[in-house]
């Protein structure tokens, strides 16, 4: 601003640029953690956001000033119907020094699920058992060259009537724990069978949540960047809800706040704690159901605090890539709010 004598701090974070719409509603992780486990397991799962509630629990974090006391905690609920592992992807080191796909082995899939998958693909998916046997032999012959294994999983939104959809989300999940041979045997045993979230995560542990935030549309700089509104005195014909100066006309610097898309961004929330995993919806459903969602009917997670995204939006749940602490067990929950959310 030309009339200022003191500098003002820059507005907005450069760490979340570009502020554009996400390319897909269910993002996949760009990196995966390494877990210390002798038993192989998937490093991620997919769930659907239900809403929020609150509970009372005994604080079990040793460094907390309320350790051992009953505390009030806002929580989020994620419904996690079983997923179906579809295929194995083996990755080896490519000629340019980057991991590349060696081959892809598909297991036995039911006809109903196969039809739903074909609706999501441009070309019709045909599974030739003879070719698949050859691909499995190729994986076994190159076990020493394989860097890691990943699994294609399909969600089952048809089990969640609140979503009003049947087409599954198909994502790739890395396998962790054990060695490559034990991982391959584990994946071959679960292909084509329903996999519960209890087979991936446990109560009390931390997870990372990857998803897309609520969309806000096209917004100005005051809401989008937190720019301070100019004083509305008798000389503000050039506007008050805008930046004082955008710089030279021939090239506007990238760090100057500009109006544009706000929300519907890909974001990752780290170290969200699973307080409870349950199969009994009666323990979480409020009277009348969750507003704008309905009634939980499948296995669900209770997550400490708020999470990103709108209700009914798919979220990717991943093992924590840098955990802040390692909970030893699940906390003791003394009360769960079941009162109606509709007043």
Curated annotation (Swiss-Prot):
Which GO BP annotation is one of this protein's? translation
Question: What GO CC terms are in its UniProt record?
Answer: cytosolic large ribosomal subunit
Recorded GO molecular functions are: rRNA binding; structural constituent of ribosome
Provide the family line. Belongs to the universal ribosomal protein uL3 family.
Q: Name one Pfam family in it.
A: Ribosomal_L3
What are the start and end residues of every segment in region (Disordered)?
1-31, 238-262
Q: What is this protein called?
A: Large ribosomal subunit protein uL3
Q: Which UniProt keywords apply?
A: Ribonucleoprotein, Ribosomal protein, RNA-binding, rRNA-binding
Question: InterPro entries recorded for this chain?
Answer: L3_arc_euk, Ribosomal_L3_dom_3_arc_sf, Ribosomal_uL3, Ribosomal_uL3_arc, Ribosomal_uL3_CS, Transl_B-barrel_sf
* Known partners and oligomeric status: Part of the 50S ribosomal subunit. Forms a cluster with proteins L14 and L24e.
Species name for this entry? Sulfurisphaera tokodaii (strain DSM 16993 / JCM 10545 / NBRC 100140 / 7)
Per the entry, what this protein does is: One of the primary rRNA binding proteins, it binds directly near the 3'-end of the 23S rRNA, where it nucleates assembly of the 50S subunit.
């Amino acid at each position: 601003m030309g009339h200022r004598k003191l500098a003002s701090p820059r507005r907005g974070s450069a760490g979340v640029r570009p502020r554009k719409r996400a390319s897909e509603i269910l993002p996949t992780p760009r990196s995966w953690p390494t877990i210390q486990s002798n038993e192989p397991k998937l490093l991620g799962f997919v769930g659907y956001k239900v809403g929020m509630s609150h509970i009372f629990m005994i604080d079990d974090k040793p460094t907390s000033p309320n350790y051992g006391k009953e505390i009030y905690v806002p929580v989020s609920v994620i419904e996690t119907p079983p997923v179906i592992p579809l295929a194995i992807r083996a990755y080896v080191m490519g000629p340019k020094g980057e991991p590349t796909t060696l081959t892809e082995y598909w297991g036995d899939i039911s006809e109903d699920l196969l039809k739903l998958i074909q609706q999501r693909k441009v070309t019709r998916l045909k599974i030739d058992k003879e070719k698949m046997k050859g691909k499995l032999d190729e994986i076994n012959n190159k076990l020493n060259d394989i860097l890691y294994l990943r699994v294609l999983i399909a969600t089952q939104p048809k089990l969640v009537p609140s979503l009003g959809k049947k087409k599954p989300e198909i994502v790739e999940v890395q396998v962790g724990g054990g060695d490559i041979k034990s991982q391959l045997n584990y994946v071959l045993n679960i292909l084509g069978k329903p996999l519960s979230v209890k087979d991936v995560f446990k109560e009390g542990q931390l997870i990372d949540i990857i998803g897309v935030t609520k969309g806000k549309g096209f917004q100005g700089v005051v809401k989008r960047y937190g720019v301070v509104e100019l004083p509305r005195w008798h000389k503000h014909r050039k506007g008050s809800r805008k930046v004082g100066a955008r710089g030279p006309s021939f090239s506007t610097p990238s760090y100057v706040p500009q109006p544009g898309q706000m929300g519907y961004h890909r974001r990752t929330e780290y170290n969200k704690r699973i307080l409870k995993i349950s199969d009994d919806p009666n323990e979480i459903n409020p009277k009348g159901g969750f507003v704008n969602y309905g009634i939980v009917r499948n296995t669900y997670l209770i997550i400490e605090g708020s999470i990103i995204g709108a209700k009914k939006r798919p979220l990717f749940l991943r093992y924590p890539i840098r955990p802040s602490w390692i909970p030893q067990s699940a906390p003791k929950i003394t009360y769960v709010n079941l009162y109606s959310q509709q007043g």
